Amino acid sequence: MRHSAAPIRAAAAALLLAGCAESPPPVTAERVLAVGGIQPVVNAVALSPDGSVVAVGDMDGELVTRELPSGTERWRGRVAAGRVDGLVFSPDGSLLASTAQDGRTFELWQVLVGRQAAVLEIRDSRTAAFHPTEPTLVVGSLGALHVVDAQRGEITRTLPNAHGGENVYAAAFSSDGQALVTASDQGNIKVWAWPTLTLRASVSMSKSLEQMAPVSLVIGRQGTRAAANGLLGRVHIVDLAKQQEERIFDNTPEAPGHGMHAEMRRSLAFSQDGDWLFAPAMHDRGVRILNLANGKAYPVFTGDAPFYKAMSISVPSSLVALLRPGDEQGRGPYALEVWRLTYSTR
């Protein structure tokens, strides 16, 4: 069942993003869409860069895209892999990549018409990252990195054993496309020069169960700072230039069904200037913004869900899409929510 949600005004901060480092930015959020009554176990959500489409994937392998802000269903499709674990749009919004960590294939879909553009034999794909300007993407599969020509739907290069026997769990390009950053299942981050894929830097995050499953990874505009959140939800900030961990922001589960954060892929996003980071709120009840200079966290909004199980943040379109369970145990029926961010001005 689809319905338009009554706007929910969120908690706001006090000063401009460019203002005093001791003060939070004036970000407010309003819920602009809610789609409830979803029966399959939804597992992944993604926003197109321009904010015109939201895609949802579930554990049964079904893809559903909706137009924004209306929420009108555009198309449904079913992936060959049998499940959807991650979704990512191409920079121009024309393609949608679907990963399946226990599947035998990786897929590209044409967003406009809902047709498969390519089905590639890439097993256990954990992550995919589109190049910002080239028709190319990188797929992490077990320990390898596969370079894929998005136009032809072909693998053009494979870098085996990219992390020295560790599996690749996350990947992201810098905004200028000159660097690729990857994270392994053991919490090791590597920075690769593009397109040569020569190693530029390597950093290890603090060793614990937390780092053994990084689920979201982003790199700042200057390419000198990266952020990752892991299985327990903590956010790790890494100084790539100094090749060391900079700071950690905590997160904890709250509801009984909220023990792990394995579905929080693509739940981090740097601000345009790279000085702030959007991230899941404490207990995954909404969104907060982190001041990377002083280590403080400020609320952006808190929803009424017991917790959110997946999230996608699009800074260019000022939108956040979230998936929520029906109860504190993480069971259905599930729902999709979309919130719009607003920045105040002086």
Describe the function of each predicted region.
Residues R9-G19:
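Bacterial N-terminal signal peptides
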Residues C20-R346:
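WD40-repeat beta-propeller superdomains and closely related acidic/aromatic-rich repeat-like regions
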Residues M1-A11:
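Bacterial N-terminal signal peptides that target proteins for export
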